[in-house]
Swiss-Prot record:
Name of the protein: Gibberellin 3-beta-dioxygenase 2-3
Organism of origin: Triticum aestivum (Wheat)
This protein's encoding gene: GA3ox2-3
GO BP field: gibberellin biosynthetic process; response to light stimulus
Class of enzymatic activity (EC top level): oxidoreductase
Function field: Converts the inactive gibberellin precursors GA9 and GA20 in the bioactives gibberellins GA4 and GA1.
Length: 369
């Protein structure tokens, strides 16, 4: 289907299907500065992406080791039905297959957090990414998606029903994983309950869903589906199709590790605010999405974080006798720091780090308040 004339000139839209080459607007330098290795090796191999089975009685220990060493892991045995994951992927594929004119009804304008278009972080870069995205809040799912389906017909109702079912499953899973994270920090069951009673981390966590479509690319060596970045919130579940493309950055030596596409598995990424909450014991992970010549790829990011007004600082229980490494910051405040970091090349986490002397005078802030 040809692109309507009025859309071919719209800066918010690029017709990936019609592209026979990668234009300079979408060509990224430095994509091959580091080697790429396969992360599907057997457990124990240095580049094998950790796998955590939530049914394992030692799952908390496995979560802790993966969060400390990688900042990410593959999650299996999570209890989310496979048939639901299949329906979610099919619904996402159908949405991105809509005509351009329909998708553009929901385009994300500058300053908007929800809608259709490029990834939200794309505004920080001069080059465009080889992908389309759609962001919405599960709490406002039906109103957000009315922009895309204003008549609220069958497709709208079906899409909403599938995403609402997925949200219910994922929100319950997030609570279970949060508990595993806290146990991995060394908290007892009673301490986990006390932390939740006092600070209500699980109760108040907010969720955002971001859908991605990475079209096949005529020259994947020049294009990038999603720029390397860390997630800003607590942690993220990534549901990816059976086409690999997610890569994690590893040091010693520097390299990109391709996450294997495992049926039914989800990827969990630790975010920056969780690194702050755990005082650096668990660290966020740089990751990116690459494209290929043969196949489209779909993914869904389910992002968890604190409410906008909540200040996040290291948990007392995470300090283990060490000083606080970060100052208290709200999510919006941290996003402002990240914006400065993107434009200057600095590290956002280093910009909110505090010195030992500062930590000695800042103990009253060492809570999620």
């Amino acid at each position: 289907m040809p692109t309507p004339a009025h859309l071919s000139k719209d800066p918010h839209y690029f017709d990936f299907r019609a592209a026979r080459r990668v234009p300079e607007t979408h060509a990224w330098p430095g994509l091959h500065d580091h080697p790429v290795v396969d992360g599907s090796g057997a457990g124990g191999e240095p580049d094998a992406v950790p796998v955590v089975d939530m049914r394992d009685p030692f799952a908390a220990e496995a979560v802790g080791l993966a969060a400390q060493d990688w900042g990410a892991f593959l999650l299996v045995g999570h209890g989310v039905p496979l048939d639901l994951l299949v329906r979610v992927e099919a619904a996402i594929a159908g949405m991105f297959a809509l005509p351009a004119s329909e998708k553009m009804r929901a385009v994300r304008r500058p300053g908007d957090s929800c809608g259709y278009g490029s990834p939200p972080i794309s505004s920080f870069f001069s080059k465009c990414m080889w992908s389309e995205g759609y962001t919405f809040s599960p709490a406002n799912l039906r109103s957000d998606l009315r922009k895309l389906w204003p008549k609220a017909g069958h497709d709208y109702r079906h899409f909403c029903a599938v995403m609402e079912e997925f949200h219910r499953e994922m929100r319950a899973l997030a609570d279970k994983l949060l508990e595993l994270f806290l146990v991995a920090l060394g908290l007892t069951g009673e301490q986990v309950a006390a932390v939740e009673s006092e600070q209500k981390i699980a109760e108040t966590m907010t969720a955002t869903m971001h859908l991605n479509w990475y079209p096949k690319c005529p020259d994947p060596k020049r294009a990038l589906g999603l720029i390397a970045h860390t997630d800003s919130g607590f942690f993220t579940f990534v549901l990816q199709s059976l086409v690999p493309g997610l890569q994690l950055f590893r040091h010693g030596p520097d390299r990109w590790v391709t996450v294997p596409a495992v049926p039914g598995a989800m990827v969990v990424n630790v975010g920056d605010l969780f690194q702050i909450l755990t005082n650096g014991r668990f660290h966020s992970v740089y990751h990116r999405a690459v494209v290929n010549r043969e196949s489209d790829r779909i993914s869904l990011g389910y992002f968890l974080g604190p409410p906008a007004h909540v200040k996040v600082a290291p948990l007392r229980e995470a300090l283990a006798g060490t000083p606080a490494a970060y100052r208290a910051v709200t999510w919006p405040e941290y996003m402002g720091v990240r914006k400065k970091a993107f434009t200057t090349g600095a590290s956002a986490l280093k910009m909110v780090a505090i010195s030992t002397d500062d930590a000695a005078n800042d103990t009253d802030d060492l809570i999620l308040s």
